Amino acid sequence: MPENLTTVVGFDFGSHWIGVAVGQTLTRQATPLTTLKANDWNSIKRLLDEWQPQKLVVGLPLSMTGEDQEMTESAKRFGRQLEGRFGISTVMVDERLTTREAYQIAMAQQRKKSKQEIDSMSAALITEAWLQNHDAD
């Protein structure tokens, strides 16, 4: 693990909303930050300026069999746009079941969460998945 790699910002891309989380390589944990409207590049820039990440992680929506689905190419394009616009290395991470896991966490907390809160929780789970396994990257 590179010594200077400390902050990671993760995204759960959707056609209407993008969940955002921040993670740290030291703890290998991530925290939900917010949910942004899709294509809100100004807000994304503000978040990246604030957190100064060394890596961006984008959830890759695949079918349960691991094949591309309708949103897969859109998420890949979003990842390429992030890297191109901001010059920060961007990786795609399999996001299968993260939304379901986020709903289960919300149920365990016995508190109803909005769709936007679920999206940012999903972004945290995607980010943590990369943090737990990034040595293989």
Set out the residue ranges of the language-model regions.
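Phosphate- and other anionic-substrate recognition elements at nucleic-acid/protein interfaces
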Residues: 2-9, 15-137
